[in-house]
Amino acid sequence: MSIRTPMKLGIPKGSLEEATINLLARSGWKIRKHHRNYFPEINDPELTARLCRVQEIPRYIEDGILDVGLTGKDWLLETGSDVVVVSDLVYSKVSNRPARWVLAVAGDSPYTRPEDLAGKRVATELLGVTKRYFADAGIEVNVQYSWGATEAKVVEGLADAIVEVTETGTTIKAHGLRIISEVLLTNTVLIANRAAWEDPCRRRKIEQIDLLLQGALRADSLVGLKMNVPTRCLDAVLDQLPSLNSPTVAGLRDNTWFAVEIVVDNGVVRDLIPRLREAGAEGIIEYALNKVI
């Protein structure tokens, strides 16, 4: 059974926008944006796409304005929206690692622990989560909402500390700040409206989106290797391959050769290929993967 009316997909606008559109493209959904238009085209008749602020997507999905979308776990906690969390998708603006909301102070300040900030001003965009963090720790602070340029608040003397999101810590350090605590570890999540999730046809579509997004992310860390191996070297080549991976081994028309194919972690290829060559493999081909399901 097909979906009668297209489902509304929320795509985060801003820092996650390009990474999300690229991930969707690798998953099979091409997004075509129009200048100053929040309704990009998508190559799926069962979906319509909308660009929304990442902070607003949880509320829109709870209210049924959107059926499914991608947002941050941080903003889901901040809004407290009642939605279905379909899956964690660990990617961010520049990496496939979680981001961190950290508590940071001026590099030359005397503060070394959250407790040192009792009675002080803390600026952040993540107001509710930050208030709960200090309340749970029993520390009374004045948490103030920051409308942007949060890193500059301490430098300008507008706050004693900030809670800000970072992937690498580079921007924090560039502003002369020092991290004294981690408030929250966050990543992208795929979320769905509860009514949409309970509808069998719409749920099937949401699960399709999840399956292919997960497959594209998994493929990011893997590569495929193909090679030809003479029979006399087969055992030596197989001994070099990671023990957790089971290669495909097929005989060639010339029965003194085998074709070997395997998927391995991208991080080991640099060292693995020379070892395979030394063990007797020839015609080694490395190729990228779009999805691994």
Swiss-Prot record:
Keywords: Amino-acid biosynthesis, ATP-binding, Cytoplasm, Glycosyltransferase, Histidine biosynthesis, Magnesium, Metal-binding, Nucleotide-binding, Transferase
Top-rank EC class of the record's enzyme: transferase
Pathway(s) served: Amino-acid biosynthesis; L-histidine biosynthesis; L-histidine from 5-phospho-alpha-D-ribose 1-diphosphate: step 1/9
Annotated localization: Cytoplasm
Top-rank lineage group of the source organism: Bacteria
InterPro entries named among the record's database cross-references: ATP-PRT_HisG_long, ATP_PRibTrfase_cat, ATP_PRibTrfase_CS, ATP_PRibTrfase_HisG, HisG_C, N-reg_PII-like_a/b, N-reg_PII/ATP_PRibTrfase_C
Family: Belongs to the ATP phosphoribosyltransferase family. Long subfamily.
Name of the molecule in the record: ATP phosphoribosyltransferase
